[in-house]
C-alpha cells in the first residue's frame, strides 16, 4: 500500500499540490501573456486578467473545499483522541472555526478580483491570511498539549518553526504594505500590475509580495505535517433508514448501512 493510500493522508497532500499548481499555472499564463511582471507579482495579480482569472478562480475554489475537508478531518481526529480534556476541546473548536473562515477568505479572493471589487478582494485576503495564521498557531498549541503521549516532540517543533516563519512573513507583509499604500506613490498603485525598478515604492512592493509568497509556503509546509497524522484516521458515513420504502408513514426498525468516507479502513 502506497503512503497516500493509508487513511486520509491524501487530503493534505492534495490540498498542497492543488493549491501550488493553482499558483504556478496562473503565474505561467499571466507571464506568458505579459499581464504581470515575472519578478514576484502578488499571487492574486496572476489571476486578475482573463483567461488566467478563470483558471485561478475555479482552481482556488476547489482548494478552499479541500482546505475545509482537511481542517474538518483534523478536528475530528483531535476530538477522538482527546474526548474529555476541556482545554483541548475548546482549542479544537476554535481551530475549526478559524480554519473554515480562512477557507472562506480564500474563496473570496478567488471570486472577487482586485480589478472588480477591490474592498471585497482585500477583505478575503485578510481573512485568508489572518485566520490561517491563527489556525496554525492554535494547532501548534494543540500539538504541544498532546505531546509526548499522542504527538511527538519533533512534530511540535516543526510546526512551531513554521508558525514563526509565517509570523515573520505576515509582519513583513503588513508593515511594508501599510507604508506602500499609505504613502503618496500614485493614485493607480492599487490596480498596478506592472512595476519597474525606478518606480516609487518598488522596493516596498517587492518585499510585500515576497512576504506574501513566503507566507503561502509556510502554510504549505504546515499542512504537509498532517500527512503522517492522517494515515491513522478513517471517517465513515452512516445511512439511517426510517422505513423499508420511501413512502412508509410509520417508523420501523431497519438495519443501518455503514460505509467508509473517502478511504478504506486503516489496518
Swiss-Prot record:
Pfam families in the record: Frag1 (PF10277)
TM spans (from-to): 8-28, 53-73, 87-107, 118-138, 160-180, 203-223
Gene name of this polypeptide: Dram2
GO biological processes: apoptotic process; autophagy; cell population proliferation; photoreceptor cell maintenance; regulation of autophagy; retina development in camera-type eye; visual perception
Protein name: DNA damage-regulated autophagy modulator protein 2
Keywords assigned by UniProt, alphabetized: Apoptosis, Autophagy, Cell membrane, Lysosome, Membrane, Transmembrane, Transmembrane helix
Family to which the UniProt record says this protein belongs: Belongs to the DRAM/TMEM150 family.
PANTHER family referenced in this protein's UniProt entry, alphabetically: DNA DAMAGE-REGULATED AUTOPHAGY MODULATOR PROTEIN 2, FASTING-INDUCIBLE INTEGRAL MEMBRANE PROTEIN TM6P1-RELATED
Organism in which the protein naturally occurs: Rattus norvegicus (Rat)
Membrane topology term: Multi-pass membrane protein
Function statement: Plays a role in the initiation of autophagy. In the retina, might be involved in the process of photoreceptor cells renewal and recycling to preserve visual function. Induces apoptotic cell death when coexpressed with DRAM1.
Chief localisation class: membrane
Cell compartments where the protein resides: Lysosome membrane; Photoreceptor inner segment; Apical cell membrane
InterPro entries assigned: DRAM/TMEM150_Autophagy_Mod, Frag1/DRAM/Sfk1
Gene Ontology CC: one annotated term: Golgi apparatus
